[in-house]
Amino acid sequence: TRKIIELRHLIDAFFFMKIIQLHDYFKDSTGVVTDSRKLIQDCLFIALRGENFDGNQFAEFAIEKGAKYALVDRPEIARKNERLILVEDTLQSLQELAKYHRKKIKAKIIGLTGSNGKTTTKELINSVLSKKFNTKTTLGNFNNHIGVPLTLLEFDEDTEIGIVEMGANHQKEIDFLCQLAQPELGLITNFGQAHLQGFGGIEGVITGKSEI
């Protein structure tokens, strides 16, 4: 049992070291980009995968067009350039990077969810708080398992208050997003009929949104 525990600690330490190293790459870049059509000079391109696309295919292109580093999860791609950084899973790495970055910044986070009205409420809160504080908010409706990490990575040491919109269509999703954002204050706009199938009914909606 002791050997198993020691092995687990070694694995955790190795993973933590990789996240620290990845955060160094992030700090050495001009920001994170996941769309090769929207590259900015010296950015960190993260090659995400989807049902109908594989960002790994655009990693070399991203480097050629000005990305400083590109995060990939296909070994055969990573071998082609020393600035192509291999990880086990690019989405998980994005999320863990955001979680680590959140711990490094001093901003107070407001988490905002609800069946509807989130974006409008977010903008209203920001319009008030920005008069006194340095605030940053979710861009548009980037409020899911990809959008929330990208939002957190936009916050820097000068950010005093961050307003993070969180969307969900099934239970445990808000809980996961809160693990990333670690909000000091949670707000729920309302409980409605949206995503009833995913939540299993209105009671599921209430339970899911209340995870904040």
Predicted regions and their residues:
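Phosphate-binding loop of NTP-binding sites
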Residues: 92-212
